[in-house]
Every structure is written in C-alpha cells, then in structure tokens.
C-alpha cells in the first residue's frame, strides 16, 4: 500500500554554483557512500548527481510529511547508482519500499519518491483485529 508520494525540483544553475564553490555542500547533503560516487564524476555529472540526490532527499522528506529538519536529515536517505545507472534509494528511518526517479535537463532537476508501506505486518494486524473483533467475550 502506498504511504505517500513526494516531488521536488531544483534549478541546475543553483546546484552548479554550489558545485563550483567546492565540496562543502556535497559533504553536507551526501552520505559517505554517495560522496564516494560523486567524487569520481565529471563536473557536469557532479551537478546532475548532487542535484538529483538533493531533490530525492527533499522529495522523501515531503512524502514523509515533515520536510528536512528534525524528523528527516540528509543522512537518513541514501540514493546510490547501480551499474546500469539506475538510482536505488534506501532509508534508515523507513522500512518499506522506496521507489525513486530522477529526471534532468539543462535547466531543472526533478525527483519523485513513492513510499510503500511494508504490507506484511499491516495486513496481518488487520486480519487479526478483524478476527478478534468477532469473538465473544
């Protein structure tokens, strides 16, 4: 069952400016493993990668319902690139499945995150509650 959906977009020019200033923003936003992937990229790909990861984290926090802050930090969400280049997003605060997508052109980067609740335990609790509610005391 879908818990929620989050979307974020950011201008490429904004990310390009922070990439041009050095690694400070990247170190703040990216996990250690994301930063390791980031370091191996060309300048143009660094902009796309950092912007995409920032947008994914923002989209996740919106789907979580809080935004980035006390409830969700940049470290709580990690999106790594598979060998095929597809993003795989995980979180240390959410145990369900996370579906993510990043799109970019020369001007904007957009990310979408869908959170899917772990179905097994919810379904089991629902069935158990239904069975117990029909019992005589």
UniProtKB/Swiss-Prot annotation:
Gene behind this protein: acpS
UniProt cross-references to HAMAP family, sorted A to Z: AcpS (MF_00101)
Family: Belongs to the P-Pant transferase superfamily. AcpS family.
InterPro entries: 4-PPantetheinyl_Trfase_dom (IPR008278), 4-PPantetheinyl_Trfase_dom_sf (IPR037143), ACPS (IPR002582), Ppantetheine-prot_Trfase_dom (IPR004568)
GO cellular component terms given for this protein: cytoplasm
Keyword Lipid biosynthesis set for record: yes
Keyword line: Cytoplasm, Fatty acid biosynthesis, Fatty acid metabolism, Lipid biosynthesis, Lipid metabolism, Magnesium, Metal-binding, Transferase
Residue positions binding Mg(2+): 8, 58
GO MF annotation: an example: holo-[acyl-carrier-protein] synthase activity
Enzyme class name: transferase
EC number: 2.7.8.7
A Pfam family assignment: ACPS
Name of this chain's protein: Holo-[acyl-carrier-protein] synthase
Recorded catalytic activity of this chain's protein: apo-[ACP] + CoA = holo-[ACP] + adenosine 3',5'-bisphosphate + H(+)
An annotated GO BP: fatty acid biosynthetic process
NCBIfam families attached to this UniProt entry: acpS (TIGR00516), pantethn_trn (TIGR00556)
Task performed by this protein: Transfers the 4'-phosphopantetheine moiety from coenzyme A to a Ser of acyl-carrier-protein.
Subcellular location: Cytoplasm
Cofactor needs: Mg(2+)
